[in-house]
Structures are given as structure tokens and as C-alpha cells.
Regions:
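Two-component/phosphorelay signaling modules centered on CheY-like receiver
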Residues: 11-29
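Short amphipathic alpha-helix used as the core "switch/output" element in two-component signaling
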Residues: 61-72
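Acidic catalytic/metal-coordinating carboxylates
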Residues: 33, 59-62
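Active-site residues of response regulator receiver
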Residues: 52
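Acidic, metal-coordinating helix/loop segments flanking the phosphotransfer/catalytic sites
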Residues: 30-48
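The feature encodes the CheY-like receiver
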Residues: 56
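Alpha4 helix (beta4-alpha4-beta5 surface) of REC/receiver domains from two-component response regulators
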Residues: 62, 82-100, 104-108
Length: 116
């Protein structure tokens, strides 16, 4: 079973994501704070990390940079409402596996990336 770490400042979106992933047979741990998610990922159980760019305690780019310093290289997918091209290019440069806009059909796009 895939274990997904999801971090986003929106409680509504965390619940929505957890429900979606559960329906797909995945275990999901949700966090509001990036620091808590980094600690969970460092435990080594995560198959994927799904993150927004607005977190309760840090920005999404800072969170991604922190993840990249961990010894395990867990794939990261960004699900965001931001469509700023410069910001999205910076995320690609940080090595994210995929960027999905919340305004689009994010469930279908996420399913393709996760292969579910």
C-alpha cells in the first residue's frame, strides 16, 4: 500500500485529498505545517509527498528545499492554485515530479502521476 504525506494549509483540501487517496487504496497522513511533514518524511515511510505552496509555518519552496536535504529522495507532487509561470519554473528546478493546478481536473492529473 502506498503511503502518502500530504501537507496543505487548507483543512478542507486536506480532508478532500485524504478522501480521494483513501478511495484509491492509499494511506494518507495529512499535515498543516511543513515542519511536521518534514519529520514524517524523514521517518522513511512515504511513497510520495503531495504539497501545496501555502503552509502554516513556511512557504512551499522552503518546504521543498528542506525535503531535498533529506537522505531519502521521496517524489514530490505540488498541487497549487498558483499559476505564476516563474514560480512554477522554480519548482521544476527543485526537482518536483509534477505540478497540478487546483483549478483544473486535479484528481485525474494526480491519478495519472500516482498511476491509480
Amino acid at each position: 500500500m502506498k503511503h502518502v504525506i500530504h501537507v496543505d494549509n487548507s483543512e478542507f483540501f486536506r480532508k478532500l485529498m485524504k478522501s480521494f487517496l483513501s478511495e484509491k487504496g492509499m494511506e494518507c497522513e495529512s499535515f498543516e505545517k511543513g515542519e511536521d511533514a518534514v519529520n514524517a518524511v524523514s521517518g522513511g515511510r512515504a511513497s510520495f509527498v503531495i504539497t501545496g505552496l501555502s503552509l502554516a509555518d513556511m512557504g512551499g519552496e522552503e518546504f521543498l528545499k528542506r525535503l531535498m536535504t533529506l537522505p531519502q529522495k521521496t517524489p514530490v507532487i505540488v498541487v497549487t492554485s498558483s499559476d505564476e509561470i516563474k514560480k512554477l519554473k522554480r519548482l521544476e528546478a527543485l526537482g518536483v515530479k509534477g505540478i497540478i493546478l487546483k483549478s483544473g481536473d486535479w484528481k485525474t492529473e494526480l491519478g495519472k502521476i500516482l498511476r491509480v
